[in-house]
Design a protein with these regions (language model features):
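C-terminal segments that line or cap access tunnels to active or ligand-binding sites in enzymes
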Residues: 274-380
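A conserved FAD-binding loop/helix module that cradles the flavin
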Residues: 36, 425-447
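Rossmann-like flavin
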Residues: 75-156
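A glycine-rich dinucleotide-binding beta-alpha-beta segment and adjacent secondary-structure elements
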Residues: 138-148, 365-429
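Helical element adjacent to the flavin cofactor pocket in flavoenzyme catalytic cores
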Residues: 163-218
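N-terminal glycine-rich phosphate/pyrophosphate-binding loop and immediately adjacent elements
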Residues: 1-102
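Active-site-proximal substrate-binding core of FAD-dependent oxidoreductases
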Residues: 208, 448-453
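Mid-domain catalytic core of redox enzymes
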Residues: 174, 204-317
């Protein structure tokens, strides 16, 4: 966005490849995604279409998921299918729950209220229970959100819930390829407009002089000067990069460091035998218990629900790799914090194996014999994400938003240092939709700053 406006942009990426949670990684001959599984609102006129069109991302091979069923939900001994399009979706839910027609009409109206200030101050769970009386329908309306946000009854704002659900009901899309395609497209766009992206540049310090950041210092000894600095690291990490500062107050640093974070994700990546399973153009969500608002894996290691996503096959009509995701609390892996990637202790590996076994058991209730189709597996935990992306507690969605105190949990892109800005999922909204909108807002604030100066 800034490069297109004529600014000279330099991106410093701490990892060997750019992209953060959008990137994919290679094992054997396959690429596996870390965070990009499907995207909502890419139809013309949809919530993300204009932004993606402007960024050149609509040139990528997006494939729409099944119109009649992009989410297949197995919960409470029944199967529910979500179709795309708000009207079709509401009608489908009415066919499952005809006695909830009035509440579902109100829910349909809610999906259009994505910019209402009142939603930031409204508890999502309390609002949903005020319009929906059937407890199973409440779970069906929430199930696909389990790996999109932290479904926490006590704190989740209605604003966050609706923004995480509505774009996908508009339309849902998978990329015919891996997340690196999206990352490469963005990098190419930056370079086409005169910018640059440098990898293996781990910023360890932001140097301040006369009330402004003047330099970014990297672990390899290199340094870079600029007029404006934008950090998409977690706000607590951003604050730690700034040394002694007369402008960045201790109370602000303390607030960023003490703010509760959302849970992380356990991901099980499966490589399947060739030709063993036909491709399914939808997600499968499977729940051991009919309560998706309390399902994060804790120290008991009980897996209560999973989401399954299949990669679009490059050739033929059979699945080659599947990702299985389930929420996981930081407390499960906290004792292993400080151990090194690929050199974790035996107990950590045993813990991952126990969780993976339960994920597979749930998956086999809807795909019988899946275990026999598997060639290889890999898995990651919140600790993996912390070590790669420096996200405190391996949080999947950044700061926990709280309806009861939105001013404390919704962070401004502006910091107390006039030329240091922040962006990313801890600010306004998380997810691909959220960080795109937040990035646009950050750019607006930078432009305001430039005009005022």
């Amino acid at each position: 966005m800034m490069a297109k406006e004529g600014r000279k942009v330099l991106v410093l990426e701490r990892q060997h490849q750019a992209g953060g949670c959008m990137q994919s990684y290679r094992r054997g001959r396959l690429n596996f995604d870390t965070g990009l599984h499907y995207v909502g609102g890419l139809e013309e006129g949809g919530q993300l279409y204009d932004a993606f069109e402007s960024l050149g991302l609509m040139t990528l091979p997006w494939k729409q998921m099944d119109a009649d069923c992009f989410e297949e939900i197995h919960i409470g001994g029944r199967t529910f299918r979500w179709p795309q399009g708000k009207k079709r979706f509401i009608n489908a839910m009415k066919s499952y729950f005809p006695e909830e027609e009035k509440g579902l009409d109100l829910y349909g109206e809610l999906l259009d209220c994505t910019d209402e200030l009142w939603m930031q101050k409204t508890n999502a769970w309390e609002y949903l229970t005020s319009i929906i009386s059937d407890p199973l329908l409440l779970q069906v309306l929430s199930a696909p959100a389990t790996c999109k946000m932290e479904l926490r009854k006590e704190t989740l704002p209605l604003f966050t819930y609706v923004h995480g659900i509505a774009p996908f009901i508009e339309s849902s899309w998978r990329l015919a390829g891996d997340g690196n395609m999206l990352v490469s497209c963005l990098v190419e766009q930056i370079r086409a407009y005169g910018g640059e992206v440098l990898t293996d540049k781990d910023v360890v310090s932001l140097k301040e002089e006369n009330g402004r950041i003047v330099q970014a210092l990297c672990a390899d000894g290199t340094s870079y000067e600029a007029g404006f600095f934008v950090s998409n690291a977690h706000p607590a990490v951003t604050c730690s990069l700034v040394g002694e500062s007369a402008l960045m107050k201790k109370v602000f640093r303390r607030r960023m460091g003490m703010q509760p974070n959302t849970f992380g994700i356990f991901t099980l990546h499966l490589q399947l035998r060739s030709g063993s399973l036909p491709y399914f153009n939808h997600n499968k969500l499977v729940f051991a218990e009919p309560d998706c608002w309390d399902m994060a894996v804790d120290k008991s290691l009980a897996v209560k629900g999973i989401m399954m996503s299949a990669r679009i096959p490059e050739k033929g009509g059979n699945v080659v790799n599947i990702d299985i995701l389930t929420p996981m609390l930081w407390e499960v892996v906290e004792e292993y914090d400080g151990t090194k990637l690929f050199h974790r202790p035996k107990a950590y590996k045993e813990m991952k194996a126990r969780v993976a076994e339960q994920c597979l058991a749930l998956a086999e209730t809807v795909i019988p014999g899946l275990g026999e189709m598997i060639l290889k597996t890999w898995s990651s935990t919140p600790l993996t994400y912390k070590d790669y992306n420096l996200t405190p507690e391996g949080s999947a969605f950044g700061f926990r938003k709280d309806f009861s105190n939105p001013m404390m949990t919704i962070v401004s892109p502006k910091t107390q240092i006039p030329n240091l800005f922040m962006t990313g999922q801890s600010l306004m909204l998380h997810g691909l939709h959220g960080v795109t909108m937040t990035a646009a807002y950050t750019c607006q604030e930078i432009n305001k700053n430039t005009i005022s100066e």
